[in-house]
């Protein structure tokens, strides 16, 4: 685990799933269940490789690989239903959450930049009673281009009214890491609540 000096940053943009919350096992389980209902076995790595991507785009990727997904809309809706049935069990990653609280205490602006739906973000923040710590939410519902496109992070900077050099992204998934690079923002790469490396813009 590396040590990071967060003092230069005035804006913090946190990915949600796999970064701030340990939700990926819950997402994978939901995806696998829907796949099973469509008579095929889904490799967990397929989902982990697409961390940060929208559910819609993940289903399109499944379709491209020849999987029977039926209605894309219904497939996504069923996955969301299964995930949300267990959302109150999803824990926070403590080290990443500490970065958030310490940044907030010194007056930095806090945004969540995620490929998940807004309702999931709102529920997670309420479940853990941390809604008051987050200034802005940029969800899958708020953008037209999803990670690895930089729109999520560009919108976060716009809302925070800060330039890239004053911001940092905290991310675990390759699409989000690529999005941060495209937005010219420093990116702290995390894995299972460990700080792996700091990618400079």
Task: Show which residues each predicted segment covers.
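Asp-based, Mg2+/Mn2+-dependent phosphohydrolase catalytic module
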Residues: 1-10, 101-104, 117-201
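A metal-dependent, Asp-based hydrolase signature
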Residues: 52-82, 102
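Short beta->alpha linker loops
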Residues: 26, 50-54, 91-95, 116, ...
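Phosphate- and divalent-cation-binding pockets in alpha/beta enzyme and binding domains
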Residues: 30, 58, 95, 120-123, ...
